[in-house]
Amino acid sequence: MSSLAQQLQSIASLDAARLTSAYGAPSGKSYLFPPDVASSHDIDSIFDLAQSGFDELLSLDPEMEEFEEELFSESAKRTDRMVLSKEENDNLDRTLGRCLRRLGKWIRLMAGGKCIEWMVRRFRVHEMNVDEVLRSFLPYHESPNFPRILAIVTIPKTSPYYATFAPLVKNAQPIPRSYIVTSISPAKDKSLVLLGDIASMVQQAVKEGVVHHALLTFWTATMVDLLEGARHGKGANEGVVKQLVESFVTLLETPKAGEDVNAAVYPPLVLLTRTVPLADEPFLAIVSSLLTPGTGSNPSQRMLTLLVILNDRHTWSLGLGEHATENLAKVSQLGEILVAAMDKYRFEKALNIVVKSMLEKPDLHAKALATVLEHESLPTSVTELASTNLLQLGSSTDSQEVKAACKSLLTNLRERHPSIVDTAFLQASASLEIDTHPVDHGLVQKPSGEVAFLDVYAADISSRVTGVKSVIDMAKKGEEIESSITALEARLSDVDENVVNALYEEPKSLLEILPVEKYIAGVKPVFWAVSPISHIIGLHLDFISQHLLVSHPEAGKQIYESLLFPIFLSTEKRQPLTKSQALKLLNGGFKKLDKLSTIGPEIGKAREEGMKGAQKGNLVIAKALAGATLSSSTFEDDISFLIAQLDSTTSSARLLAYLILHSLVLTLRGPRQLSTSLSILKYLSPRLTGHSLRDLKHADENVNTEYMESVYKKPEETRTTLRAIVSILAAMGKVIKPIGQIVWLSGESKAKDASYKTFAQQIYLWANIAILPANVAHFLLRSLLTQLGEEALLFFSSIWTSSTSPVPLRISALKHALAFIHAYATLPTSPAAQGQPVDFQVVLPQILIALQDSDKDVRRVAVDVLRSVEGGEGMGDVYALDTIYGDRSEMTQLLKSVDRKKYIETLLEVAEEFVIDRLRLKAFHTEVLNMQSGKNRKESAHRRAIIGFLMSHVASYRAIDPRLVLLSLLSDVHDTSILRSAIPLLASLFDDKSEESLWLSSLPDGQQALYVQALMGSLRVQSVSVLGEAGGEGWEFLLNLLDASKSSRFIARLRILSFKAMVGGVFSALEAHQQIEYIIALIQCIHALPTDDALDAVKVLEKLDIQPRVLIELIEHLSDPLETSVNRKRQRQDAADEDRPTQAVHELITFVDSRNWPSIPASAPLVASLMSILSALLAKRLIVKEGIDYLEQEVFGAILALVERITDAQEIQRAHVGIEVVIKVIRASTNPRTAQRALLVASELARLIPDAVLHNVMPIFTFMGASDFQRDDAYTFGVVEKTVSRIVPVMTQSLKEKAQNSLELYTKSLTFLSIFTDMAGRLPRHRTLPFFVHLVKSLGASDYLAPVCMLLVDRATTKAGRNKESVSTALELPANLVAAFDVSVKTQVLGEIVQELARLIGDLSKADKEAFLSQTISENDATDRPLRQVTYLLSFLSSILGQLRGKACSQALVQSAVRQLIVLAASTSQPVMATTDIPSNLHKTLASTMLLLSADNFLGVTAELLSDGSEQDIIMSLGVFAERLPLIKSEVRLRCTKVIAEILKRIGDLLAASGATVNAALEAVKSVTKTAIAQEDGALASVLPTVVGCIGKVKDSAVIVAALSLVELLVRRLAARTIPFIQSILDTSLNLIKSTKLAATATNQAFVTLSSVIETIPTFISSKQLNAILITTIDYRRVEETNSASLFTTLAKKIRTKSLFPVLIEAWKTVQEKGGDNEMKGFFEMLRLTLKNAAREDLPSMLKPVFAFFLDVFDLRHRLQLKGVDTRVVNDVEESAIGSFLELVTKLNEPTFKPLFIRLYDWAVIDLAEGKNADDGRLTERKIVLLHVMMGLLTKFKNLLSPYMGILFPHIQELLPAFASGSVRSEPLWTLLLNVLGKSFEVDSGAFWTDALEIELLPQLVAQVPLFLPIAPSPQSPRPISSCLANLAGSTTAENVLRRLNTAVCLATRSDDPKVRLAALDALSAIWDAQAEEMVGLVPETVSEFLAELLEDESKDVEIAARGVLAKIEKVTGSLKEYLE
């Protein structure tokens, strides 16, 4: 890929593919739709979908509004995330995250899915916010929503969700919660990142206020399952516990989190505390968090959770946290919660903890503590805790509030648990210091006030008396007022005389304390008691009379109703008022009571007669109270009270109320009697259901003896109450009908009519249902009918026509009506008595209503009534003609006798059918009354007479149900007379004050709607003629409905119904002029109505079917105000002429917008008419204020819809339709949408009138370039594309006919094409490419793709053309444009561009310009613009070549391009291009073009170039060869083996020449080697020596490295084929390594090359070669160790030990000669690796020489010291040698190794010992080597080598005394010996050392303490003897050994030499450090006998050291002062 292409690709938006795939439509994955459906939705349709969903969510969640502007607005449609900065993207991510979390609640709603679809398609949240998306969907993991989103997400590997969900994406499906739980467990996710993410979900949701039920359910269940798994598994991971605790605590402490959030935490929290033994700190954090206030949690739930986890914690003493007491005080109803928990679960342990915290501040918890401590089942432990703490706190506090709280609680506690409190008191007295805080005895004693309140409620009478007095005294002092009132109120109901007397002892005080309401409430139970005590009532009456009523006379009515009423009635068992008590009602304050002032004497008289006169007295009192009520000023209230008492549970009050009301019904007259009776009936009606009163005897309207006896003797019996009910109902027969006419058949009666009508109907109901005794029912019915008289039939009609009347009642009414009609003739006043039958036709509509009744029996009786009114032709007067409907009766239209008779006879003919089917009557009228062909005028007159008769009753009968029934009869009758009759009724509804309107307004909305709908139903197609009648009201009525100036309650409903009729066919039946008038009125109505009503009207207008001829005429009428000619006829002249054009525009908009133009028949005259609107608008554009743009757009849309369907061009021409108006509108309008629609029209007209369009094509496209190209919306570009696709082909066809060749065609099209290319920089970026692709396809890609691309490239040559874009951005467009077409077109463009390049380069030296792009250069352009044109075309050409690379191109075209480019390359030597990049770019282009050749051709061209080309061409061809060769398939290479061999041969020649082509040649060979096939190995082998040879000829390190790297590849590739060249490779590599001038990289590569030879062919490397390699590598180790070590490892692994070891022996000689320590270390490292990698089977045969070699090596110390080498160097070398020896030992078994070790021992100890002194230096050196080896063995093999200490032990026993005696003085040997012994003690583990051996060796070891004292000890390097003795002590626990060791060392501290004493103390210190615990028993002798002396040593250093030892001992034992005294 070229550098330009790389730059273009790097800056391309990731949205490019999506935006260009369908010209702006979104592509890719979709949440809602399958891929095939998703691809059909563009960005606008997805946005509309999202908008609808967002609007719905906004109504559900107003908080969604915050995302509207940024995510769901028009601006969001243009957001491209790929071009945003990082900061902008981060901000957008945060917004998207919040939005997704809020959408989480609505995922299951379709509205939520729409919003998510938008975020997926627009913001790619499924790729760029995948974590937030998954978090939002996780709560729905088991629903279908989850797999739907999972299937489209792209999860990055860095996401915590990757491991869990990435494997599920391919086959997404709902997943179980167990899968998620497993994924977040530490077994799957050790980092716990996913767990932390899920655990924080709720916290984040609370923070943002987006908590929802699904989230909480998921979170809780997941946490619970996770903990359950831990509970049943291996337990919870520490990290899991930490995360969960933090999460739970944070949520519990979150302010205002809410009840649901907190409830979600409790289950996993409890499970956590039960599963994991939490440490104190996290447990305390949980407990404290549970007490956090202000979280919005349910206090009961939270406290119960706290109690559960506290009760589960077996030992908890840290309380509840720092602020627990204060927080507990904020818990609502804490006491009740604790008591409930105690009752159900006990929770004794937890309760103790909570109560203890509350007791810290009892004043804050006084109420809650009292509730808990007063509980009857309080645990003893809580009682004891509370007693102790309260006593202690109350005694020690200075706060009076706290002390009072403690005292109150303790006092109550002591009453319930005296022994526990007393015990606590005694214990507190004993424990508290009496002087400071003596226990306050008063804490457990109640205050006098509390005693008084307790006494008030005591069972003992004397206590209650005392308590009452005390409470009154306290209240008088102002203490405890509320409590006092409560206590005294309770005692008012006391039945003991002494207590009552105590209450009234101070009446004034009692009045001051008790409010009147409280007093009445307190004393009321006494008066209403079942068995009241008369003398107690007397006491109360005295107080009320003498004091209460005197002070509060206003309370009289309340006292009468609440206290006195139930005591008036006397029964056999209840005598509340004796004579003496009754007399009290005559005196004092009772005199002032209204009712008692008049009935007082009667009460007294009633009680004087004693028991015998009690029954009579009750009646007397009742009548007296009735009379008092009659004269009362509060009559209505009194009646309400009496009726309420009918429900009283106290029989006395209930029966007394019945008696009083009975008396009132009989006594009252007029409205009061009627209203009272109605109230009683309303009360009784629902309460008598299920009761039967028929068996009650002696029941009548009078109160008889039986009734009063039942009241006196059996007041509680139900039968007594029923008798009272019957009696009062019987009294209703005395209610008198109001004077005057009552309109029975009306729904709008006056108040008196309504009351009596209701009363009469109720009485009729009672009289006809089988509940009352027969005599009572007959009496009531007779009384009612007597008063009704002739009105009875109308009354019966009102009953059977009422929908509320039960079926039996309707039947009774019809039967009574039948009887009335038969009996009416017998009345003396009846016309029938004079021989004239009565005409009952006025009730015929009511009979028709009954015939439609739902009950069959009703219909049957109705038929009988119908027969009874049939009569003959000569009927007399009409019954109730003037009274049936009251004032409206005159509107009733009567049938003629003939018509009446015929109508009834016709009905009776099918009467039985009416009985069977209630709907038959309607069908009958439909059959009879509809117009029928063949009927004469007489029949029509009869039919219309009946319709008029029925409609007149509809108009007169002002009751909704009858009207609806009658109208339903005519609903299917089609006759104009119905509409004529209905119009006056409808028109009256325009006036809200009319009677009809007022009546209808009083009805429920449902009935209003049915009525209006029934009337408007008469507006049908069949009755349209009524609307056209001269002088008729119909048409005016319709137009008035459209008059917005008229306001009425019903006009809107009428208008809607009229619309329905119009749409239903009425409009189509109108005359054309009526249609026009109606539509104009409708349009004007739309503009005047409110928005909602206007929308309804618009919908109607849209549905009206208007024919084209009417449309044309309508357009003329509506356009009149826009015409400029003053002579044009106007339909209407308005006052405000200047506003008429604007108004006309609005009306035209409404009209044009209402038509569905695609469904209207296409008509050229109609198009011309619409064009006339545009012409008129052009003239009025300046004076029209608004709407003109929209109208133009809609008109263009209409024209477009019509023109698209017109196929006859001649029709358009005949209608004189032209394009000039369209062009004028385009030029005049500034609205882009108008111009767009105009362009669409122009594009359609191009098909019909092409010549006219071509004449105006340049203005069209100039406008497009200046305006539409700069807008970014799908519609605009749809318009542009359509315009281009229709007009451009017309233009190009004309140009092609004029051009002779492609260059001429380009030149002639230059101006036309420049319109588009000049605007490329101003187009919206993501729409630029789709447009040009469409443009080129419309032009023809084969002809115009090349010139369009050339012009687009030419834009980059000037700043103006680039339009502030960078060059790379400008060149991106043509490159992407070419990419949209197939290979053949691209190849063709490639050839055209090469030709243009040739023309441009030729024009550089010509005066007459030939090139196409030269025509774009002007005189003002810069002189270098032609060079820039060439440069940018070359860059563009590179882009094309990049797109064609690897594609199958036309070889002929490519070869032609290559030939032309070669010619051009030769011509770039012109001076004008010498300083530019053109030559090099041209060569690159040539090379890229060559890549388009096939592999065969490519290899052939390469071979030719290597033979004939220039050096630069060879370099280029080799580079291309190296780059492209790996792309050739193996089967093709197999075919080209000879060519490749020839190429390699030529490359070998180039390498031999070592010219400038070497580097390129090496790369070419390297490319062949890396991808070679087997058949090419021979050719590669032939070139290998040349490659090796060239290394010595070149000087450049980079080339040397490349050559060596190639040699390495060749060696590894060719393997055995490289054997002949091993020596040359090794020589070259070793020479390079030895070179001191070579760069490190070359040396490194030389080592790599050597390694490749050793690894590939190790068996073919000779010993001599190996020796050279070893020596060179060992020498190089001085310079750098890494390469040497790597090569050592390779040699050791690849060369067999048998072959390598002799070479090592030989090399050892050379290394020794050099004598360098570095070389020796390197040698021994090589030896170690050799032995490490040696095969075990090879060692036995080599063991003797190897061991001999090591013995020789071990003598190296001696030889090196003879040379004066530094000891440290000697030690390092020896360490290296020993390391090698240890590798050998690792390979040996014990039988093999042991003899070798013994031989090593002999070598070190015996071989040189004969005849020499023991202090011989060389012998000492060998011993040092032996001990070094032993130390290494012990370190490496631990106790496995301990037994070998037995071999050394005899010699050790010799050496230790020798050192002690001074015969041996080698400090290194001494140090090493002690270290070996110490190591042996350390690792032994019982393998060698025993107590006996240790004891044996102990004296010799201790004897070493005084030796080599100059060695100063330090923590890092202690004295060897001290370490050795410490290891000895640490290796044993035997007391004998430790005692001997301790004693021996302690004895050494008594040396005279202070240095020795110090050394001994150092050893002693190390010994106690190592085994202090086992030596505790040695403390006495060690401290008292030795350390005590040393602490007083004369040497300060000794004293300090002794104190140090003592301190170490005291760490184990504690203070040892007693041993030192």
Swiss-Prot record:
Coiled coil: none annotated. It comes from the Eukaryota. The keyword Translocase does not apply. It holds the Pfam family BP28CT. GO terms for biological process: maturation of SSU-rRNA from tricistronic rRNA transcript (SSU-rRNA, 5.8S rRNA, LSU-rRNA); positive regulation of transcription by RNA polymerase I. The keyword Repeat applies. GO terms for molecular function: snoRNA binding. HEAT repeats lie at residues 837-875, 976-1014, 1281-1319, 1935-1973, 1977-2015. InterPro entries: ARM-like, ARM-type_fold, BP28_C_dom, HEAT_Utp10/HEAT1, U3snoRNP10_N, UTP10. One of its GO terms (cellular component) is t-UTP complex. Its main location: nucleus. It is found in: Nucleus, Nucleolus. Signal peptide: none annotated. Keywords: Nucleus, Repeat, Ribonucleoprotein, Ribosome biogenesis, rRNA processing. PANTHER family: BAP28 (PTHR13457), HEAT REPEAT-CONTAINING PROTEIN 1 (PTHR13457:SF1). Belongs to the HEATR1/UTP10 family. Involved in nucleolar processing of pre-18S ribosomal RNA. Involved in ribosome biosynthesis. Component of the ribosomal small subunit (SSU) processome. This is U3 small nucleolar RNA-associated protein 10. The gene is UTP10.
